[in-house]
């Protein structure tokens, strides 16, 4: 009979953690595994390093539950920096910032609502999409030239929160 050095019930857990900015999902999982003193853990879904949000983390046999969890729809909150030009389309690699003219609030709301529905888009090169097992953002940081395939997404609802012009 095999001798256990841990409490069998405590090794199987399913938790939701809030991943902070500036860290990859894998790096954050490593911290979570150390905190809970558990080597066997995984997460569902990957957030870009420059995104913060919820990761579902499973320990032990509970990682088998991921296939039963509904992953959509998701909710996103974004801050849009008008006039900023960035190679990565986020706060990394900002090339320049230009002052833009004040935009009509009704026009902003109209454009935001026009996004509702099914959209086809090409993900940015600085994304967590994988190309032959490697994250696109890693290849982009190394200066590799590559193309990502188009993706489809559905936007079910938009909500305008605020607008502040400099």
Regions found by a protein language model. Give the residues of each.
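Catalytic/RNA-binding core of pseudouridine synthases
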Residues: 1-166
